[in-house]
Amino acid sequence: MSLSIELEFKQDVLLVRLTGELDHHTAEELRSKITEAIEKESISHLILNLQHLTFMDSSGLGVILGRYKQVHNNGGEMVVCAISPAIERLFNMSGLFKIIRFEPNEANALQKLGVA
């Protein structure tokens, strides 16, 4: 299966909706799309909606951690929302939830970043 990447801009927030599998085959495409969008659109914050993400491996974790650092170094925040139980376990095991905020849905994530 492949990965579908949907980007939406709301003020200074980049909202990324992922559908499918985030693995070593698709991680580079996600990295480049998010990095390009952050740089071109003056994005401060990043929301990842993982509701329809069915699989993620360590390559996906690496991309997410790298984008967290990119946003954080620019004074912004990253929020992950609508995560499935399987992906949530991966986040917990990797320790990503210690540094990346989790919200139950997009509306909550946008509200926490001041966009409603």
Swiss-Prot record:
Write out the GO MF terms. Answer: anti-sigma factor antagonist activity; antisigma factor binding
A Pfam family cross-referenced in the UniProt record is STAS
PTM Phosphoserine: list the residues.
58
Please provide the Gene Ontology terms (biological process) for this protein.
sporulation resulting in formation of a cellular spore
Q: Where would I find the STAS domain in this sequence?
A: 3-113
Question: Post-translational modification, briefly?
Answer: Phosphorylated by SpoIIAB on a serine residue.
Q: Its family?
A: Belongs to the anti-sigma-factor antagonist family.
NCBIfam families from the xrefs?
A: ant_ant_sig, spore_II_AA
What is the protein name stated in its UniProt record?
Anti-sigma F factor antagonist
Q: Which source organism does the UniProt entry give?
A: Priestia megaterium
